[in-house]
Design a protein with these regions (language model features):
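Metal-associated gating/positioning segment near the N- to mid-region
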Residues: 1-33
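Generic structural signal for hydrophobic
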Residues: 8-9, 17, 71, 98, ...
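Conserved, mostly hydrophobic/aromatic
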Residues: 9, 21, 108, 127, ...
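Short acidic/histidine-rich active-site segments
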Residues: 22, 151-165
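Catalytic metal-binding/acid-base residues of hydrolase active sites
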Residues: 23, 57, 84, 133, ...
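Extended substrate/RNA-proximal surfaces in nucleic-acid metabolism proteins
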Residues: 28-129, 137-140, 196-203
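Mid-to-C-terminal alpha-helical segments outside catalytic/metal-binding sites
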Residues: 173-203
Length: 203
């Protein structure tokens, strides 16, 4: 529940949280407006900025551009695409389609190619370093390539329940575990803040 997730985030000291449930063509028009409604209800009542969004999941690459556009039209201020994680059989070409569509974040992009890293940088699409088990097995590759070629990185919890929320210390450890030096960690947090600020301007 968004209310519970936000309450737990507030108790953990979060300043902002994106509510980005998994969506596809079957539920996007139901989920996003309801998350938007919940975020509006909480505004001014909680010490956390609540950003309504969506994670477009297992969509054929050919549909992703229209789905990103449709999600924004429904009120999603933060649009994520479920990338080519090694933990699931995500269709090849999803990473490229997400970048072309101008998603805010490409989640767990797996063994992302150099070409897609460069394109993500060009399109200002951030790549996710994830704290979630399974999806995180390619964190090292994503981090190494992003640092080498200058792509933006964010750290995400990929929370599916309130227990998945992590502390700042845990986030730092996940980043260091991916091979990101301490001197770059602040840049990752700054990118996350910038994305949230941009998303809040869409509300």
């Amino acid at each position: 529940l968004p209310f519970e997730l936000v309450r737990r985030a507030a108790a953990a000291g979060y300043k902002a949280i994106g509510i980005t449930d998994h969506v596809d063509a079957s539920n996007m028009d139901l989920v996003i407006p309801r998350v938007v409604k919940a975020a509006k209800k909480l505004k001014g009542l909680v010490p956390v900025e609540v950003v309504p969004g969506a994670e477009i999941t297992h969509a054929p690459p050919e549909l992703i551009k229209d789905m990103v556009k449709g999600a924004r039209e429904l009120g999603a201020c933060l649009v994520i695409v479920h990338g080519e994680t090694l933990a699931e059989p995500v269709q090849e070409g999803t990473n490229r389609a997400a970048i072309e569509a101008g998603a805010d974040i490409l989640a767990h992009p797996g063994l992302i190619s150099i070409e897609d890293i460069l394109y993500a940088n060009e399109k200002s699409v951030a790549l996710e370093i994830t704290a979630r088990k399974g999806h995180s097995i390619s964190n090292g590759h994503v981090a190494q390539m992003a640092v080498k070629f200058g792509a933006q990185l964010v750290i995400n919890t990929d929370s599916h329940s309130p227990d998945d929320l992590i502390t700042k210390e845990r986030a730092e450890n996940v980043l260091m575990g991916a091979g990101i030096g301490r001197e770059r960690i602040s840049l990752v947090f700054e990118t996350s803040r910038n994305i949230i600020e941009k998303a809040l301007r869409r509300i």
